[in-house]
């Protein structure tokens, strides 16, 4: 019984960590994309 409880708690902690990592990765990807768009826009303005 104790082992099942510990395993359940551990599983919840691992799952929450994985979900947090996914959201963090998505946020980093969006930040990089926005940075690339800003650089592209600056390059276009410089060419004009």
Swiss-Prot record:
Q: Which residues constitute the signal peptide according to the record?
A: 1-21
Organism domain of life: Bacteria
Q: Where is the lipid attached (S-diacylglycerol cysteine)?
A: 22
Pfam families attached to this UniProt entry: Entericidin (PF08085)
Q: Where is the lipid attached (N-palmitoyl cysteine)?
A: 22
Query: What's a GO cellular component annotated to this UniProt protein?
Result: plasma membrane
Q: Where in the cell is it found?
A: Cell membrane
GO BP terms: response to toxic substance
- For this UniProt entry, what is the primary localization, expressed as one broad class? membrane
In the bilayer, the protein is annotated as:
Lipid-anchor
**Keyword terms of this UniProt record:** Cell membrane, Lipoprotein, Membrane, Palmitate, Signal
InterPro entries per record: Entericidin (IPR012556)
The job of this chain, per UniProt, is described as:
Plays a role in the bacteriolysis. Is activated under conditions of high osmolarity by the factor sigma S. Entericidin A functions as an antidote.
Q: What family is this protein classified in?
A: Belongs to the EcnA/EcnB lipoprotein family.
Q: What is this protein called?
A: Entericidin B
Instruction: Give the species this sequence originates from.
Output: Citrobacter freundii
